């Protein structure tokens, strides 16, 4: 992940994004200075060099509009809360308070997540979800059969693939070493739907 930006650097980055979106080309240093209310182009240049050092843009000195937004900078980033831990195996009690936040590029997932949950256990490895992963979750109290969900059972939470029947629900692991969890439909609470994952940078 790139270094955190100051408020002013974020404003300059937003200015570049908007110019690319509206005009199809990056602004000049003079245009940035004018839009941002800087006294000179030098102030714009200072912020641009800082953005380059932090990995958001690449400057091309041989071009008049030589500002290239790197992919994650084009979409921007947002801080998503890590709100607890989910056992991918044996359900554990949810931790409701926010442990920390993690910067995630906007547009990384097809559906925008609400929060991240940390996986403990290996019951979903065949679905590509490993111990220590941060799963991106879209908050929802409904889900379709076949979706990977965060489910609450008796005030404990787990992540599994949901299979719905007429009067019951089955939470399916993605590891043959674990048994499916079958519960009455009226005792199952859906907390959210899995929309993707990122490897937790704090796990390495």
Swiss-Prot record:
Task: Give a yes or no for keyword Glycosyltransferase in this entry.
Answer: no
DNA-binding region per Swiss-Prot/TrEMBL record: 29-49
Query: Under which main EC class is this enzyme filed?
Result: hydrolase
Q: What SUPFAM superfamilies does the record point to? A: LexA/Signal peptidase, Winged helix' DNA-binding domain
Q: Which residues form the active site?
A: 123, 160
As its record notes, the protein acts as a catalyst of: Hydrolysis of Ala-|-Gly bond in repressor LexA
Please provide, alphabetically and separated by semicolons, the GO molecular function terms listed in this UniProt record.
Answer: DNA binding; serine-type endopeptidase activity
Q: What is its EC number?
A: 3.4.21.88
Classification via CDD domains: S24_LexA-like
Query: What GO biological process terms does the UniProt entry carry, in alphabetical order?
Result: DNA repair; DNA replication; negative regulation of DNA-templated transcription; proteolysis; SOS response
User: Which key words tag this protein in UniProt?
Assistant: Autocatalytic cleavage, DNA damage, DNA repair, DNA replication, DNA-binding, Hydrolase, Repressor, SOS response, Transcription, Transcription regulation
Q: rRNA-binding among the record's keywords?
A: no
Which family, according to the similarity comment?
Belongs to the peptidase S24 family.
Q: What the protein does?
A: Represses a number of genes involved in the response to DNA damage (SOS response), including recA and lexA. In the presence of single-stranded DNA, RecA interacts with LexA causing an autocatalytic cleavage which disrupts the DNA-binding part of LexA, leading to derepression of the SOS regulon and eventually DNA repair.
Please give the subunit comment from the record: Homodimer.
> What PANTHER family does the database record attribute to this sequence?
LEXA REPRESSOR, LEXA REPRESSOR-RELATED
Protein name, entry field: LexA repressor
């Amino acid at each position: 992940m790139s270094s955190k930006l100051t408020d002013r650097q974020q404003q300059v980055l937003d200015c570049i994004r908007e110019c690319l979106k509206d005009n199809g080309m990056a602004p000049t240093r003079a245009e940035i200075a004018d839009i941002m209310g800087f006294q000179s182009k030098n102030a714009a240049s200072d912020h641009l060099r800082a953005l380059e050092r932090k990995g958001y843009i690449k400057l091309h000195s041989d071009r008049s509009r030589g500002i290239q937004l790197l992919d994650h900078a084009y979409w921007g980033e947002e801080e998503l809360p890590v709100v607890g831990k989910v056992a991918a195996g044996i359900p554990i009690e949810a931790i409701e308070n926010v442990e920390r936040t993690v910067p995630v590029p906007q547009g990384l997932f097809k559906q925008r997540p609400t929060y991240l949950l940390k996986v403990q256990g290996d019951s979903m490895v065949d679905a590509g979800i490993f111990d220590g992963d941060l799963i991106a979750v879209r908050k929802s109290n409904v889900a379709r059969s076949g979706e990977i969900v965060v489910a609450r059972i008796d005030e404990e939470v787990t992540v599994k693939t949901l299979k719905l029947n007429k009067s019951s629900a089955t939470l399916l692991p993605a590891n043959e070493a674990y048994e499916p969890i079958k519960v009455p439909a009226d005792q199952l609470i859906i907390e959210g739907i899995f929309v993707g994952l990122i490897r937790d940078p704090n796990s390495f």
